[in-house]
Regions:
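Alpha-helical recognition segments enriched in aromatics with Gly/Pro capping
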Residues: 1-34, 45, 49, 58, ...
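N-terminal, positively charged nucleic-acid-binding surface of large information/translation enzymes
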Residues: 10, 19-107, 458
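Short, well-structured beta-strand/strand-turn elements
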Residues: 62-65, 135-141, 370, 447-449
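An alpha-helix initiation/capping motif
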Residues: 68-71, 118-125, 237-238, 315-319, ...
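Short, glycine/charge-rich beta-strand/loop segments that flank catalytic centers
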Residues: 70-73, 95-99, 109-124, 142-151
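The substrate-binding groove and active-site-proximal loops of carbohydrate-active enzymes
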Residues: 81-88, 112-118, 232
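Structural preference for alpha-helix termini/caps and helix-kink/transition segments
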Residues: 272-274, 278-462
Length: 462
């Protein structure tokens, strides 16, 4: 199996060859912890979790380091803490735990390291001082700024004309800047705002700019150069472009990460998601109505580089698919590893630039094989193991049913009693009573599915 990944830097799908196969290193930009994560934030979390799983399968569990940072110093954090009347630490701790609970509900593995920006201020100062010493940055009015013209191939990642970059960066053309494109590495902290001793002999307290945070954390945990850097397409410019500039100029390297991966935008029911349009949806809100696994399957049904239109219909289809798959595997354990040919077939499809739609299509085929009346327990275990590579079917059927019921406001025992009465009526050929009971359940929003084996499963129509 050859792993091929689309590299934003080269604009091509290239064979992935890590610097060191025994030490594969992945960095992904994580959340700024000031509010609940929205469904758009879930996309990179899920996509790079699948990549993490695939890398572990390919190179070994202990050979892969996945770093996803936590930005806990930011002007939005300061403003939200003041608005709520709580400390910045209280806000960031609360929001981090919300984010962690949401990602666990989505079936994501924890990254190897989740570094916090506030724990890496020393590394940021060191990087900044290196940049000033090498004439790639300068001090001006209590700020330290990166001098963009000092890097001849700045813009190589985004490939945007200079005028577009100036507009896209929404730069503040302050009078102390040597060039309009220069960006902040360090800035003064006014009274009441978090601050630390400044680098470069600046006497006033200050705080880091956004871009230097990721350069410092990736350097600390992965080194001067590493294998893969990921994030949303909106981060290509200016954030990732500026990360590259800082890191390469600080260490004199010709590369920061050899592969840059970016997931596409998300729209909600065909519209851009925004609070002003009233269609801003958090992961937490969706988890009230759906198990996280439904959200995961719906997200993976579109290739990560393509835009995705997030719809309730899509989540509903994912729920029906998972209901069928769990019914097939029952409470069988998963068979994982090199001995599972089904898992290898899914891995081959994911190796083609994380082609999750192709992998899911093949899972539908494998489900039909495992559902066959003569299918052995081994086939079901292999099917479940194959789905596990996508982070799916991680529970038993019993756990799945219970999770479905927890997500809806119905009385499961009362529903099961009505279903049992309907089954008894059908066996007695009392179809009028059976139909009446089905209608009674439908009035509560309960949809019944009569299975080939004579059992009946149910779900709540949303």
């Amino acid at each position: 199996m050859e792993l091929r990944l689309y590299n934003t830097l080269t604009r091509s799908r290239d064979a992935f060859r890590p610097y060191d196969p025994s030490n594969v290193r992945l960095y992904v930009c994580g959340p700024t912890v000031y509010d609940l994560a929205h469904i758009g934030n879930a996309r990179p979390v899920i996509i790079f979790d699948v990549l993490f799983r695939l890398l572990r399968r390919t190179f070994g569990d202990q050979a892969v380091t996945y770093v996803r940072n936590i930005t806990d110093v930011d002007d939005k954090i300061n403003a939200r803490a003041a608005e709520r009347g709580i400390t910045i630490r209280e806000l960031t701790e609360e929001t981090y735990h919300w984010f962690r609970a949401d990602t666990e509900a989505l079936g994501c593995l924890r990254p190897s390291v989740e570094p916090r920006a506030t724990e890496h201020i020393d590394e940021m100062r060191l990087l900044i001082e290196r940049l000033v010493a090498s004439k790639h940055a300068y001090v001006a009015e209590g700020h330290v700024l990166f001098h963009v013209p000092s890097m001849p191939d700045y813009g190589r990642l985004s490939r945007r004309p200079l005028d577009d970059m100036i507009a896209g960066a929404r730069v503040d053309v302050a009078p102390y800047k040597r060039d309009p494109m220069d960006f902040v590495l360090w800035k003064p902290s006014p009274e009441g705002v978090p601050g630390w001793p400044s680098p470069c002999g600046i006497p006033e307290r200050g705080r880091p700019g956004w871009h230097i945070e990721c350069s410092a954390m990736s350097w600390r945990h992965l080194g001067e150069t590493f294998d893969i850097h990921g994030g949303g397409i909106d981060l290509v410019f200016p954030h990732h472009e500026n990360e590259i500039a800082q890191t390469r100029c600080a260490f004199g390297t010709n590369m920061m990460a050899q592969v840059w991966m970016h997931n596409g935008f998300l729209t909600l029911e065909g519209e851009k998601m925004s609070k002003s349009l009233g269609n801003f949806v958090t992961i937490r809100e969706l988890l009230k109505d759906w198990p996280g696994e439904c959200l995961r399957l719906a997200m993976l049904s579109t290739h990560y580089r393509q835009p995705i239109n997030w719809t309730r219909q899509g989540i509903g289809f994912a729920a029906k698919t998972l209901d069928k798959w769990y019914r097939i595997v029952g409470d069988e354990p998963a068979e994982t590893g090199e001995g599972n040919p089904f898992e290898a077939e899914i891995a081959d499809r994911l190796a083609d630039d994380i082609n999750s739609p192709s992998a899911i299509t093949h899972l539908h085929h494998l489900a039909d094989v495992a559902e066959h009346v003569d299918a052995s327990s081994a086939l079901k275990r292999r099917f479940k193991g194959a789905a596990n590579l996508l982070g799916l079917l991680n529970e038993t059927e019993s756990q799945w049913r219970e999770r479905q019921r927890q997500a809806v406001a119905v009385d499961p025992e009362a529903i099961e009693a009505l279903i049992a009465a309907r089954i008894a009526a059908r066996k007695a050929r009392d179809f009028a009573t059976a139909d009446h009971l089905r209608e009674q359940l439908a009035a509560q929003g309960v949809v019944l599915m009569d299975n080939k084996d004579g059992t009946t499963t149910w779900e709540v129509a949303r």
